[in-house]
């Protein structure tokens, strides 16, 4: 949250140059505060586990957040009961007339399938297109990040020969984005995917900014220049056991998966896993919710044209 300071305080310029979030008394006095309304499109097989992971991160911020859960209406969930889906999830038709402060689109186990061949691809495209006019900021995770970059910006992904699974070191490519406030120079994040985006294509795209990358895992954080779309190539929401559960599942299916890198102590699946990314995941979601949702969204959600541009912040 911001530090409130007197108007024209000389320290303000220094603090802002250091990427410290300060707010003048005049601006603070004119702020309206209400709960943030966030929609989650949950595409992961285990709905309840993913709900818990994302709500854990959203609940670690000082903001009050009202959450709606969204499903693809004609896609039956194999791992979650119909009662749960009907009780807690909404179809797109029930929310298309609404506006939201934030939208989170999760990953999905579809890494080797062409986007156009995904059975509910038309629904995904429709929701992404809708979000560009009805949501202040969209957070795309893993598969959804690739899908969003493909649909919105025409970037193609490369299918990997082996699944990329593990916890990798990343570095910031810039010091001055609010999203990166509080980040260490290097930080860990988990990945679990069958594809990657071309880092150079991202760098050269006029509408995109590469904020963090890894020598081993490639592009990690990509932000659209209008600050409306954040693409996260990994899984900062994963709990400690998730990569192990995926590894054991793949083993049981006879897929001969690689051992997740930098995850088990001594890289031995018989040893305990080490969670190195929880603080980063919490800070990432907190910064997104604060700087790219709360600080930009209009108080009256019925008027999305009232979004405050970064230039005036």
Swiss-Prot record:
The protein's annotated pathway: Amino-acid biosynthesis; L-methionine biosynthesis via de novo pathway; O-succinyl-L-homoserine from L-homoserine: step 1/1
EC number: 2.3.1.46
GO cellular component, one term: cytoplasm
GO terms for biological process, alphabetical: L-methionine biosynthetic process from homoserine via O-succinyl-L-homoserine and cystathionine
Catalyzed reactions: L-homoserine + succinyl-CoA = O-succinyl-L-homoserine + CoA
Entry annotated with the keyword Lipoprotein: no
Residues reported to bind substrate: 163, 192, 249
Keywords: Acyltransferase, Amino-acid biosynthesis, Cytoplasm, Methionine biosynthesis, Transferase
Site annotation Important for acyl-CoA specificity: residues: 111
GO MF, one annotated term: homoserine O-succinyltransferase activity
Cited InterPro entries: Class_I_gatase-like (IPR029062), HST_MetA (IPR005697), MetA_family (IPR033752)
Enzyme class: transferase
Protein name: Homoserine O-succinyltransferase
Phylogenetic classification of the source organism: Bacteria, Pseudomonadati, Pseudomonadota, Gammaproteobacteria, Alteromonadales
């Amino acid at each position: 949250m911001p530090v409130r300071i007197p108007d024209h305080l000389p320290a303000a310029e220094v603090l802002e140059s250091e990427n410290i979030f300060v707010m003048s008394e005049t601006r603070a006095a004119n702020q309206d505060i209400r709960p943030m309304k966030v929609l989650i499109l949950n595409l992961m097989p285990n709905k309840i586990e993913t709900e818990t992971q994302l709500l854990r991160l959203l609940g670690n911020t000082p903001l009050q957040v009202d959450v709606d859960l969204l499903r693809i209406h004609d896609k039956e969930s194999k791992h979650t009961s119909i009662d749960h889906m009907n009780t807690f999830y909404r179809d797109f038709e029930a929310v298309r007339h609404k506006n939201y402060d934030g939208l989170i689109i999760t990953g999905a186990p579809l890494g080797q399938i062409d986007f156009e061949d995904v059975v509910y691809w038309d629904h995904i495209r429709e929701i992404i297109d809708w979000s560009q006019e009805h949501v202040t900021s969209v957070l795309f995770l893993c598969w959804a990040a690739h899908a969003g970059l493909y649909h919105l910006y025409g970037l193609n992904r490369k299918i990997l020969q082996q699944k990329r699974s593990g916890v990798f070191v990343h570095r910031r490519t810039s010091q001055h984005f609010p999203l990166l406030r509080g980040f260490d120079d290097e930080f860990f994040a988990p990945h679990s995917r069958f594809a990657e985006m071309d880092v150079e294509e991202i760098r050269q795209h006029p509408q995109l900014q590469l904020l963090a990358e890894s020598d081993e895992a490639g592009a990690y954080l990509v932000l659209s220049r209008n600050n409306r779309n954040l693409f996260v190539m990994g899984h900062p929401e994963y709990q400690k056991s998730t990569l192990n559960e995926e590894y054991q599942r793949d083993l049981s299916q006879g897929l001969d998966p690689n051992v997740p890198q930098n995850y088990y102590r001594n890289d031995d699946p018989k040893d305990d896993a080490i969670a190195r990314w929880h603080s980063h995941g919490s800070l990432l979601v907190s910064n997104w919710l604060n700087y790219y949702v709360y600080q930009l969204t209009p108080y009256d959600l019925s008027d999305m044209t009232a979004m405050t541009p970064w230039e005036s912040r």
